[in-house]
């Protein structure tokens, strides 16, 4: 049976409704793929760019944690400057080029590995993964096959998860504590399975900032690749705050033209300067200020979507000049890549 296509997707099942405090600790999290590999600029970061990121973190007294450590820190309401560096896919360039730089600056990271490709021509082997783990790198689960699971059946995802966990346990002596969805694609059934297996959290590929009340099983990360990895862009993302959405509902007349409804507290946000984008282009929006300072926002594309994955992004400045960020990845499984 195909994964259910939900025309009404109630994300508040995970986000819930909660009381917002004046200060909530938050952590910017970044995702990298290849390091110093000019063949693939869309997923590569130049080594001088990556080292500039690390130097800035060091010079400005940031704690750099694994994802598991960061999720635990959020529970403590700590206000220590903190960042999380994650790496997807387990390419050799991480081991050869990035790991030495992390060691140089005394930082850790979380490396998400898809087990089927381990030992392939462009990928780390198990010995290199063990060596990275011994150097303090957290190893996360990125599936076995890196498949498009929204196009499969629930059993396929369950079996893939079991296969990857068995390989991790056999080769590393333990299964990972965190998971990264291939292509950032997930649904309710996948979330529920990952949570039921005892993982601490899971990450997707939409951009945003971690915070205590955020849903822990589809967490956002800022992508870092050559075009978007300039130091000023990295610093800007480090200083970004979460838009703490208390309710989110997604409806679609058809999959190609969704409508997203959000609710959040106005607090010190300059909502008249709200910006919304659909895959980088401006979107249609309507907004009203309801009782008790609740902002109700509707965003939608101005035309039918033609991509498999489309990122909706909302940013709002506050009275202190800080930007608050929320994004949502809309997936149309019927479109092949």
Language-model features: where?
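Acidic, His- and aromatic-enriched active-site or binding-groove loops in soluble protein domains
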Residues: 199-208
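Metal-dependent polysaccharide deacetylase catalytic core of the NodB/CE4 family, i.e.
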Residues: 25-41, 63, 72-83, 91-192, ...
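Histidine- and/or cysteine-centered catalytic micro-motif in compact active-site loops
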Residues: 114, 144, 207-208, 265
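Terminal accessory/targeting
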Residues: 1-81, 103-109, 115-124, 224-337
């Amino acid at each position: 049976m195909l994964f259910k296509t939900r025309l009404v997707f109630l994300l508040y099942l995970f986000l819930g409704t909660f009381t917002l405090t004046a200060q909530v600790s938050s952590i910017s999290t970044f995702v990298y793929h290849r390091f110093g590999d000019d063949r693939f600029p869309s997923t590569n970061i130049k080594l001088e760019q990556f080292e500039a990121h690390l130097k800035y973190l060091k010079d400005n007294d940031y704690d750099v944690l694994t994802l598991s450590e960061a999720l635990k820190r959020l529970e403590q309401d700590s206000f220590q400057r903190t960042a999380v560096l994650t790496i997807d896919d387990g390419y050799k360039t991480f081991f050869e080029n990035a790991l030495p730089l992390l060691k140089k600056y005394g930082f850790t990271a979380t490396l998400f590995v898809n087990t089927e490709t381990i030992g392939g021509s462009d990928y780390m082997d198990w010995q290199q993964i063990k060596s990275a783990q011994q150097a303090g790198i957290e190893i996360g689960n990125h599936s076995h096959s890196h498949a498009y699971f929204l196009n499969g059946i629930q059993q396929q995802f369950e079996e893939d998860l079991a296969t990857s966990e068995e390989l991790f346990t056999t080769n590393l002596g333990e299964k990972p504590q965190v998971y990264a969805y291939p292509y950032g694609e997930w649904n309710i059934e996948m979330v529920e399975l990952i949570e039921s297996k005892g993982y601490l959290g899971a990450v997707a590929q939409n951009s945003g900032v971690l915070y205590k009340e955020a849903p822990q099983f589809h967490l956002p990360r800022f992508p870092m690749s050559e075009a978007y990895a300039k130091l000023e862009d990295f610093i800007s993302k480090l200083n970004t705050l979460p838009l703490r959405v208390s309710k989110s509902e997604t409806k679609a007349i058809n999959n190609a033209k969704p409508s997203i409804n959000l609710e959040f507290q106005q607090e010190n946000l300059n909502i008249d300067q709200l910006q919304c984008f659909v895959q980088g282009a401006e979107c249609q929006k309507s907004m009203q200020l309801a009782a008790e300072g609740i902002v109700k926002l509707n965003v939608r594309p101005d035309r039918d979507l033609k991509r498999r994955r489309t990122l909706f992004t909302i940013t709002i400045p506050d009275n202190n000049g800080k930007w608050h960020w929320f994004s949502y990845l809309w997936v149309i499984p019927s479109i092949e890549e």
